[in-house]
């Protein structure tokens, strides 16, 4: 895992440099950084090829791009995909500031409306034969609106849907 001392100072997307502000997180498929270009902030995701014992990947970057298109077609609220740098395996996304659901759960600040909003996403996803990664770090609330900030989606399987898997992580301890 990267630390503040090992963070790159600058990352480029299609030859355009972005100043790295901080590491936002590491997922199954990549590292996500908060980056800046002038006064505008973005998320830059760098695909990694570290092994994941519980998940099999093909081409991670192409999967992200395909999944983004599928979710966008269903109007799932998520950050806009701004650019893809295929040779460097990087994606530039809109940055959506706000608290993640895991932070809200830990603070005891979950609102019933957030569950209604994720259920509305499920109502779009399931008929299309899809699930998303319902883990609470993948959701940000901005001004009361819930956004899915990952692009991952998979073929629907009941054991991985929100009611059977995701909800357990959205509950107050």
Sequence positions of predicted segments:
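Juxta-kinase regulatory segment immediately upstream of eukaryotic protein kinase catalytic domains
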Residues: 1-19
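ATP-binding glycine-rich loop module of kinase domains
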Residues: 20-23, 28-62
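Protein kinase-like catalytic core scaffold
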Residues: 42, 77, 91, 147-150
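The N-lobe alphaC helix and its flanking beta3-alphaC-beta4 segment of protein kinase-like domains
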Residues: 56-74
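Conserved structural core of kinase catalytic domains
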Residues: 57, 78-114
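Conserved alphaE helix
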Residues: 113-121
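C-lobe/activation-segment region of protein kinase-like
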Residues: 126-131, 142-173
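Hydrophobic residue at the +6 position relative to the catalytic HRD Asp in the kinase catalytic loop
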Residues: 134-139
């Amino acid at each position: 895992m990267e630390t503040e001392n090992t963070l790159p100072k600058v990352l480029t997307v299609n030859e355009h440099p972005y100043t790295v502000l901080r590491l936002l997180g590491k997922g199954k498929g990549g590292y996500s950084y908060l980056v800046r270009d002038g006064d505008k902030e973005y998320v830059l995701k760098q695909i990694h090829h570290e092994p994941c014992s519980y998940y099999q990947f093909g081409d991670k970057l192409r999967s992200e791009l395909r999944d983004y298109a599928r979710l966008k077609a269903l109007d799932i609220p998520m950050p806009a995909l701004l650019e893809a740098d295929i040779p460097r395996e990087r994606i530039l996304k809109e940055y959506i500031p706000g608290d993640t659901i895991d932070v809200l759960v830990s603070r005891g600040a979950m609102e019933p409306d957030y569950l209604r909003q994720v259920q509305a996403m499920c109502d779009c996803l399931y008929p299309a034969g899809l699930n998303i990664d319902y883990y609470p770090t993948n959701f940000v609330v901005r001004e009361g609106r819930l956004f899915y900030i990952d692009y991952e989606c998979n073929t629907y399987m009941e054991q991985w849907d929100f009611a059977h898997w995701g909800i357990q992580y959205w509950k107050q301890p």
